[in-house]
């Protein structure tokens, strides 16, 4: 299927109850019919006019935190891609990032401020390559970390949200400076 973006048909689009963005409707009746039938309710396919993010624009997670999850779960390893973090850093103790709320973080040409914990969702239970549910990450995280408070309520938290104070280029291997 193909469709064109109709910028004359702008709509306000709710982003999970957190904010509203302006988006353009993707023209062509086949799109709305296809997705409406799939979801069992009337929907429209739209394209955001500007980039959008889930809760906060950046997330960070330590590789030692992922290794600790694997160790506590009796697994050889856990693929960190399942957590969809923008930045993964190496070094430090497991869950060191939990202590960075309100702290300035510099990486590459960007400056971030640590926010609150990332409440994980069921998407993390899916293999990043196949999409198949293969690991009960929420249960595994909760088993050793408990359920923790986040801005989205109590749940299995893993990683840290960040605000971007100064945008800049970030590359693999850039040094992360805390404070």
Q: Language-model segments: which ranges?
A:
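Metal-cofactor-dependent catalytic cores
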Residues: 1-179
